[in-house]
UniProtKB/Swiss-Prot annotation:
A lipid is attached at C205, C207 (S-geranylgeranyl cysteine). The keyword GTP-binding applies. It is found in: Cell membrane. It comes from Mesembryanthemum crystallinum. GTP binds at residues 15-22, 63-67, 125-128. The modification Cysteine methyl ester is found at C207. This is Ras-related protein Rab7A. GO terms for cellular component: plasma membrane; vacuolar membrane. Belongs to the small GTPase superfamily. Rab family. InterPro entries: P-loop_NTPase, Small_GTP-bd, Small_GTPase. Keywords: Cell membrane, GTP-binding, Lipoprotein, Membrane, Methylation, Nucleotide-binding, Prenylation, Protein transport, Transport. It comes from the Eukaryota. It is a lipid-anchor.
């Protein structure tokens, strides 16, 4: 079992298939990017340790397929999350329009104790594509959406060149830490359950 000084934080990344969820994870955790696209099957996760003030935290970052047939991963996947990261592609309007559906999906499945104040963070990814000339979702539009959802944090990112990825995940971690209950729990059951039930996955995604 983990030391009492170490806390597990479960982060869920949601968004349509192809928006770059896996690549954002890999850029943050491994500082790597692959141009080869392989869709995530089911769900997968990466971990990274962070220090905040005098405490150590392990971020367990979960990535989903983003496809309709995998949206039934269910309660075991969503429950126990400390922060939810909603992700879209700034060059694909449909991925932005899906954000409300993903947010509702999370709130229904995770059933947080205080849904009105549960921490979400929004990432607008792939700002590097074609030098930004192909984007169809403006920063203003994205920020207006965030404002309508309680002024949640927003970052424009590139998993390919790393723009704002570190900053975004530092914010995600901070929000997750602030959301943790006063009594520290290490969610050992969550780790075991995820490890024994999650589907096999293939994860190497374009940004």
């Amino acid at each position: 079992m983990a030391s009492r000084r170490r806390k597990l934080l479960k982060i869920i990344i949601l968004g349509d298939s192809g928006v770059g969820k896996t690549s954002l994870m890999n850029q943050f955790v491994n500082k790597k990017f692959s141009n080869q696209y392989k869709a995530t099957i089911g769900a997968d996760f990466l971990t990274k340790e962070l220090q905040f003030e005098d405490r150590l935290f392990t971020l367990q970052i979960w990535d989903t397929a983003g496809q309709e047939r995998f949206q039934s991963l269910g309660v075991a996947f969503y429950r126990g999350a400390d922060c939810c990261v909603l992700t879209y592609d700034v060059n694909v309007m449909k991925s932005f329009e899906s954000l409300n559906r993903w947010r509702e999906e999370f709130l229904i499945q995770a059933s947080p104790a205080d849904p009105d104040n549960f921490p979400f963070v929004l990432l607008g990814n792939k700002i590097d594509v074609d030098g930004g000339s192909g984007r169809v979702v403006s920063e203003k539009k994205a920020k207006a959406w965030c404002m309508s959802k309680g002024n949640i944090p927003y970052f424009e990112t590139s998993a390919k060149d790393g723009t704002n990825v570190e900053e975004a995940f530092q914010c995600i971690a901070k929000n997750a830490i602030q959301n943790e209950p006063e009594e520290e729990t290490y969610l050992p059951d969550t780790i075991d359950m995820a490890g024994s039930t999650r589907p096999q996955s293939s994860s190497a995604c374009e940004c």
